[in-house]
Amino acid sequence: MQLTELIETTVTGLGYELVDLERTGRGMLCIYIDQPAGISLDDCEKVTRQLQHVLTVENIDYERLEVSSPGLDRPLKKLADFERFAGSEVSVTLKKPLDGRKTYRGILHAPNGETIGLEFERNKGEAAMLDFTLADIDKARLIPQVDFRSRK
């Protein structure tokens, strides 16, 4: 079983989604997890303990294990991510330029089959729609929406 498969099986078995996995040259293993209700420190601790056990049993070499939430600007990698975050503001970078542009920022539309839609502003207030597939994407991330106004 490959490392990604092993980690994904463990994480999903605990009721979480594996968002991303990074392995650095210095032996650090970074795991990003999520769930609809969000991730707490207790969730990260629970997954860390289970992964430490699994990685030891499977004799996987690593120096340090870090488990965290993907953050406010979480990456979107699977079609399910694009479905879940439809209506959110995102930044999408395409592998190849379209109309002389690779990076787009706009409102994500729910996928229609394999096609994902992004409503963006082309020229001073002129709305346009970009249609693309997962294969077209170099990277896609949520744009953090933070409200610093106090609630009264």
Swiss-Prot record:
InterPro entries assigned: Ribosome_maturation_RimP (IPR003728), RimP_C (IPR028998), RimP_C_sf (IPR036847), RimP_N (IPR028989), RimP_N_sf (IPR035956)
- Keywords recorded for this protein, A-Z: Cytoplasm, Ribosome biogenesis
Gene Ontology BP, a term: ribosomal small subunit assembly
Q: Which HAMAP family match?
A: RimP
Q: Which domain of life is it from?
A: Bacteria
GO cellular component terms, alphabetically, are: cytosol
The protein's name is: Ribosome maturation factor RimP
Q: Which compartment or compartments is the protein found in?
A: Cytoplasm
Family statement = Belongs to the RimP family.
Q: Which NCBIfam families match?
A: PRK00092.2-1
Gene3D superfamilies reported in the protein's UniProt record: Ribosome maturation factor RimP, C-terminal domain, RimP-like superfamily, N-terminal
What is the role of the protein in this entry?
Answer: Required for maturation of 30S ribosomal subunits.
